[in-house]
Regions:
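Phosphate-ester processing/binding pockets and catalytic centers
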Residues: 1-270
Length: 270
């Protein structure tokens, strides 16, 4: 790790990047309807302390790995409650595949299954860059660690670099804070701090998706527990467009009922 590094952003996702055949109201079979990213910014000086705390917590609840999909409801809620006392800052992003429109065909034409993932990751990193700009944190002070998967991370680095060099792209302003060469990947089994990003992505996904395991209803408790840890509007309490990005917004996502109400609450400075 570079000596100038003061923070590490750990990133994981929930859902998948397949945009060809995904579940909709009309199609009950297929890939996940959402791709959701979760990220946790950890100060370097507290990393070892947090690793020890997570290792102790893992033993306390009697699990081998802190993978949110493997935890029962009460253990997940307890995990979220534990995060409240940690020195971390959370970020998230939600994309609903139905809103992609013509972009779906564009990806298919490119035969690039990673393009959608990278574009969503760039939106997430824009949220980090916004925070860094507000806090006066320089590009070389933050390292970015994605949960390792079969993915060409050079394409992501190149995308960030290209966007930074495109003046008419509004996102370039905040992405200028991101150093592409500081992006890397690490296996979840080798870094327990990635479990915090995993929990964040899982919790955000649960708040928008109709879950078979929950009788067709989303689950909001996890996000309610985590909400205080998300970066928010410095002048209020709003986290949407600060710590969380809903691409296209809750209405164009066709969120309904309690899921829509909950997502809209993220836009409120209450």
């Amino acid at each position: 790790m570079n000596i100038s590094t003061k923070y590490v952003l750990y990133v994981d996702e929930s859902g998948d990047q397949d945009v060809k055949k995904f579940r909709t109201e009309e199609r009950v079979r297929g890939s996940d309807p959402f791709l959701v990213f979760g990220a946790c910014l950890v100060p370097v000086k507290f990393q070892d302390e947090m690793r020890q705390a997570l290792t102790t917590f893992k033993s306390e609840i009697g699990v081998k790995q802190l993978h949110s999909t493997d935890l029962v409801h009460l253990k997940t809620a307890y995990f979220c409650r534990k995060v409240q006392s940690m020195r971390v800052l959370l970020f998230g992003l939600v994309s609903k595949k139905e809103t992609l429109g013509g972009y779906t065909k564009q990806i298919a034409d490119l035969k690039d299954t990673e393009a959608y993932y990278n574009k969503c990751a760039a939106y997430l990193l824009e949220r980090l860059g916004h925070f860094m700009s507000h806090a006066g944190i320089g590009p070389d002070q933050v390292e970015i660690v994605f949960e390792e998967k079969k993915h060409d991370y050079n394409k992501l680095r190149n995308l960030i670099g290209t966007m930074q060099n495109t003046p008419h792209d509004d996102r370039a302003r905040y992405l200028s804070r991101i150093a592409p060469h500081r992006i890397r990947a690490q296996a979840k089994k080798d870094e327990i701090l990635l479990s915090l990003a995993d929990l964040t992505a899982f919790s955000l996904y649960q708040s928008v998706s109709k879950l078979h395991s929950n009788f067709g209803y989303p689950e909001f408790r996890y996000m309610r527990e985590l909400r205080p840890k998300f970066w928010k509007n410095p002048k209020g309490e709003k986290i949407a467009n600060f710590g969380v990005k809903y691409i296209q917004g809750p209405f164009k996502m066709n969120l309904e009922g309690d899921a829509l109400k909950f997502a809209l609450s993220m836009y409120q400075d209450k």
